[in-house]
Amino acid sequence: IYNCRKDIFLKGDMHTLLMFPTDQILIARILADRQGCYLHSCGVNFAGKGLLFVGHSEGGKSTLATLLKGKAEILCDDRIIIRSTAEGFKIYGTWSHGDVADVSGNSAPLKAILFLEKSEENHLIPLENKKDITKRLLSYLIKPFVTVDWWDKTLSLIEKISAQVPCYVLRFD
């Protein structure tokens, strides 16, 4: 690992070992070969149920993690791994956090995906259109240097997630 600023390296609190998001780019590639992908999302284990709150920066992921602290295990508030297993889909915490430094390497069975939208009122809206769900998931996907092979595996996985995992829009204030 190379860094020309020793003071920054020794201070710690880096979101990546290389001070550039190369680790997530490398992991995103490897996950495709292991029936997995990496999403811009907050994941929690709520009473043994994995909930995935999906959103871009400033979308409310860290806010929800803060609200759920003490009520659910925070896996990570910014980057979550999803993998297909023999038991179904699981979410895994990562070290690549946002504003909430609570992270866990634990996993939980994925029970629902909630796409975050800021609103003046709180609503939970079920999503039924699988193509819409697929498009939404693709827009939050952490991508490596893409190849045809990676896209084939990842698209297949995203379509499978869209078909099997309940998805919602969570509007909240």
List PLM regions with ranges.
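Conserved NTPase motor "head" modules and their coupling/switch loops across ABC/AAA+ ATPases, GTPases
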Residues: 28-43
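Charged, amphipathic alpha-helical linker segments immediately N-terminal to NTP-binding catalytic cores
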Residues: 1-28
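Conserved glycine(s) of the Walker
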Residues: 59-61
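Glycine-rich, often acidic-flanked micro-motifs
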Residues: 40-56, 66-173
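Short, well-ordered alpha-helical scaffold segments within catalytic/effector domains
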Residues: 23-24, 37, 155
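Short hydrophobic/aromatic-rich motifs at helix boundaries and adjacent loops
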Residues: 12-14, 36, 126-130
